[in-house]
Amino acid sequence: MFRFETLNIWHDAVAFAVKIFDYTETLSNEYKFSIGSQLNRSGLSPSNNIAEGSGSESAKDFRNFLNIAVRSVYETISGLTVAYKKQLITEELYRKLYQDGETLSKRIRKFRQTLSP
């Protein structure tokens, strides 16, 4: 088993990515390959950065990857906000994904604080 598989934040980030992919699959072709593709990349980035960072030799390096993971959540929320403003996502789903992103970013930051400097 890889170290990242033992981390709840990684499992949460994977669940977030799956929700983003589920949403982007509903987009029309007009948006699927533009904003949809960007959302998929940014939505997948948190789990990938947590996984990659967990293999770091130092806590400092791992913390850097966790910082990137948080910023990727922010990027995803920004993209979802554009989709919402363009009426490409329902308010209900937007609010749910927004809340999921907010919770995930807080959990990653909290975990980051547990790593020694």
Predicted regions and their residues:
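Amphipathic alpha-helical assembly/interaction segments
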Residues: 1-117
